[in-house]
Amino acid sequence: MSTLKKPDLSDPKLRAKLAKGMGHNYYGEPAWPNDLLYIFPVVILGTIACVVGLAVLDPAMLGDKANPFATPLEILPEWYLYPVFQILRVVPNKLLGIALQTLIPLGLMILPFIENVNKFSNPFRRPVAMSVFLFGTFLTIYLGIGACLPIDKSLTLGLF
């Protein structure tokens, strides 16, 4: 079976369309020169116009000027490092905090050996893997929210 759709030139309807200059989409349109010379530049120029238009209409506001002599009260990392930052901030021993972070990949590597299931089975019928995934997701969200709060409210999220 061919990956290209070849036209049936014995079809009289197709031959009539081709005689009129129509029907080229019936069997596929060539990439050269149609796409490369006409469609791609329109998309590229349209993208550039959108970016320039957004930059002109809604420029990003600058924040406060940096002052090297005044350090903020708490320096937060980027948002994707909040859970790791919270673990290191809450655990009293920093070596223990690093050890806790190495247990996460080790636990994920051990998980397939704990639950011996066919790789084609339904993932919703794998209770150990699903419970570990859901627990890890909720714990990550909990730690991420706690990292944004002051340290005295970070474990309870200020609820009690």
UniProtKB/Swiss-Prot annotation:
Question: Electron transport: is it a keyword of this entry?
Answer: yes
Localization per Swiss-Prot or TrEMBL: Cellular thylakoid membrane
Gene3D superfamilies attached to this UniProt entry: plastocyanin oxidoreductase, Single helix bin
* Chief location bin: membrane
Coiled coil regions in record:
none
Q: Which UniProt keywords apply?
A: Electron transport, Membrane, Photosynthesis, Thylakoid, Transmembrane, Transmembrane helix, Transport
Transmembrane segment boundaries:
36-56, 95-115, 131-151
Provide a GO CC annotation, any one.
Answer: plasma membrane-derived thylakoid membrane
Q: Which InterPro entries does the UniProt record give?
A: Cyt_b/b6_C (IPR005798), Cyt_b/b6_C_sf (IPR036150), Cyt_b6/f_cplx_suIV (IPR005870), Cytochrome_b_C_euk/bac (IPR048260)
State the Gene Ontology terms under molecular function.
electron transporter, transferring electrons within cytochrome b6/f complex of photosystem II activity; electron transporter, transferring electrons within the cyclic electron transport pathway of photosynthesis activity; ubiquinol-cytochrome-c reductase activity
Q: Which SUPFAM superfamilies match?
A: a domain/subunit of cytochrome bc1 complex (Ubiquinol-cytochrome c reductase)
Which Pfam families would you find in this protein's record? Cytochrom_B_C (PF00032)
GO biological process entries: photosynthetic electron transport chain
What is the membrane topology listed in the Swiss-Prot or TrEMBL record?
Answer: Multi-pass membrane protein
Tell me the superkingdom of the source. Bacteria
What NCBIfam families would the database entry show? cytb6_f_IV
The protein's assembly and partners: The 4 large subunits of the cytochrome b6-f complex are cytochrome b6, subunit IV (17 kDa polypeptide, PetD), cytochrome f and the Rieske protein, while the 4 small subunits are PetG, PetL, PetM and PetN. The complex functions as a dimer.
Family, similarity comment: Belongs to the cytochrome b family. PetD subfamily.
Role description: Component of the cytochrome b6-f complex, which mediates electron transfer between photosystem II (PSII) and photosystem I (PSI), cyclic electron flow around PSI, and state transitions.
UniProt name for this protein? Cytochrome b6-f complex subunit 4
Biological source species: Prochlorococcus marinus subsp. pastoris (strain CCMP1986 / NIES-2087 / MED4)
Gene of this entry: petD
